[in-house]
Amino acid sequence: MTQAEHRPTNFIRQIIDEDLASGKHSSVATRFPPEPNGYLHIGHAKSICLNFGIARDYQGTCNLRFDDTNPVKEDVEYVESIQRDVQWLGFEWNGAVRYSSDYFDQLHAYAIELINKGLAYVEELTAEQIREYRGTLTQAGKNSPFRDRSVEENLALFEKMKDGGFKEGEACLRAKIDMASSFMVMRDPVIYRIKFAEHHQTGNKWCIYPMYDFTHCISDALEGITHSICTLEFQDNRRLYDWVLDNISIPCHPRQYEFSRLNLEYAIMSKRKLNQLVTEGVVEGWDDPRMPTVSGLRRRGYTPEAVREFCNRIGVTKQDNTVEMSALESCIREDLNERAPRAMAVLDPLRVVLENYPEDLVEELNIPNHPNIPEAGERLVPFSREIYIDRADFREEANKQYKRLVMGKEVRLRHAYIIKAERVEKDAEGNITTLYCSCDRDTLGTNPADGRKVKGVIHWVSAPHALDAEVRLYDRLFSVANPGAAEDFLSTINPQSLRIVPHAKLEPSLRDAKPEFAYQFEREGYFCADSKLSSAEKPVFNLTVALRDTWVG
């Protein structure tokens, strides 16, 4: 995966190929239009890779446009985080960042054009009445009593809306289409509503705000977008997208294409539910390493290359499906296996004394940073009379399948000597506090001269040089594959999604670990220093992914 990423093929790219071949378009222009009301998640990453990837591969452009038509739910914090995420994923947008609010004046003018054409009217039914009049999937809606107002009256009332003459909910502007349409979205949809809220871009200039379906298509047209790509839930909305553009004086008419959204096992993609996890303190924030957000994945140690590869592998189709979490984990595992430098860390330390090793001797062992990349260089790792091994790597008694250290038996220390367990020291409760071993000083980097075979290999850290650290072992946030289907999704939280190891012992080279840069802790997994919690005084490392998939559900 460190090699050049392959160029994917999918039905949208086939459409683009046909459009270019036929001369329908001479170039390609796409856009990524998030609403700044939350942090981006892995589902958005799929859309980013699709839209920006198309622009890159066809030498076209991709705009970053914030769909900022609801000032109540939006925040500059989200605007900034989204820009960081897009850039982290390896993409750059065309020109300046754009906002739907950049077009509020034009959108207002197009709304007036629809009124003048008798295609929009000011509605004074309540929201509940509008829902009642809309009908159902099997029953046609009925016309509003305000539907046949004159153009002059509608213009005056819309101006009154704009000037703050109505309270929120007292009036809205609706498109006049067909209350008997078999598509609910075409039953006179609301295209403007009143909101007395300060906007993060326009301040208090407006108290009326356009709806998404009205804004989106016009913004696409104003920007000259050729292929407007969105997820399948907007498939019916394409009819409204086309209706708006067909009925206003705008030369460009983009086309909308839909693909299936990403559904990932053991995760949720609803921004509302993700926000609930944050506001109710279930997680530590939008960038909690258990969250499926781009910032959460980054903090956990995921690489942009792994995320892009995942998006390439799952592909772009029109069929809804759910992707196994192991598919995402496989991508980061493969990527880090190739690139991550190795280090040794003992998560559950057991003190070991090598009784025949000189007390005042410290050896600096040259250990390769990566077994398959010589150019990654070497590091010096201290070795001394007292070391730590993992408690799970020693047993007083064990069967033949146990290949680690057993009382009276030998094991090799990774990159170092063969040692033999001689005796233990225990506390009053019978817990082993110290393991005493002998060390074969003739086996550093070589096999025993007498030809005896020692199969087991374990990792270690020099005790006087060890870096004390907190290690956070992350697992899947939910205990069921489809938490979104549960009546109460919070009841499916995995209580073991975070386990904190407070006193891990790490080799000293990790003292300078950069946040979010992953290492392979040999025999343990891939870990990175936490970007928020880790410090020189108290290092904190996050588990990115285990060496192999051990999830049993």
From Swiss-Prot:
PROSITE patterns: AA_TRNA_LIGASE_I (PS00178)
GO biological process: glutaminyl-tRNA aminoacylation; glutamyl-tRNA aminoacylation
Motif window: 'KMSKS' region: 268-272
E.C. numbers: 6.1.1.18
Subcellular localization, as worded in the UniProt entry: Cytoplasm
Protein keywords: Aminoacyl-tRNA synthetase, ATP-binding, Cytoplasm, Ligase, Nucleotide-binding, Protein biosynthesis
Reaction it catalyzes: tRNA(Gln) + L-glutamine + ATP = L-glutaminyl-tRNA(Gln) + AMP + diphosphate
The UniProt record lists the keyword Cytoplasm: yes
Gene Ontology molecular function: ATP binding; glutamine-tRNA ligase activity
Enzyme class: ligase
Binding site for L-glutamine: D67, Y212
Residues reported in the UniProt entry to bind ATP: 35-37, 41-47, 231, 261-262, 269-271
Family assignment from sequence similarity: Belongs to the class-I aminoacyl-tRNA synthetase family.
Xref: HAMAP family: Gln_tRNA_synth
Subunit text: Monomer.
Name the record gives this protein: Glutamine--tRNA ligase
Natural source organism: Tolumonas auensis (strain DSM 9187 / NBRC 110442 / TA 4)
Gene that this sequence comes from: glnS
